[in-house]
Amino acid sequence: MEDIALLAVSKTFGAARIRECYAAGQRAFGENYVQEALEKIAALAATPETDEIEWHMIGPIQSNKTRPIAEHFHWVHSIERDKIAQRLNDARPARLPPLNICIQVNVSGEASKSGIAPGTEVGLADSIASMPRLRLRGLMAIPEPTPDASLRRQRFARLREMQKNLIARGH
């Protein structure tokens, strides 16, 4: 069985609260506002006892924010465009390991949600695979909230099929 890691969404919480969570054993923190995250990253980088923090960008990415994301984050969970992936690749410092990438999928087809449409994942995955400073790690989806358990299972089953398709193609 593979390990499961908890990603604590730390947006809107300050560095002091993150430090408390870190002391309790939490290591992965998700942010979706770049400026807010950079302030926390800087504050916590000055503290040696928090040197194992893993920063995850979980929000939408604007082109003008790719450089700080590439320079300060370990993971990006919201890639939906080749242009953003390319900019992250180009901005990722060579001294850092490749940036871990998840392709965001709009499994429920909601107009208000970001993400690629199911069935279009191969092209973006192929493109990311050709970028040496990025490492494709998986797919990410946030389906619509629904009390219908069958519909929830359907959405995640579709995501699982997409994952199998990518694995079969060597991703």
Residue ranges and their predicted role:
Residues M1-G170:
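Conserved alpha/beta-domain cores
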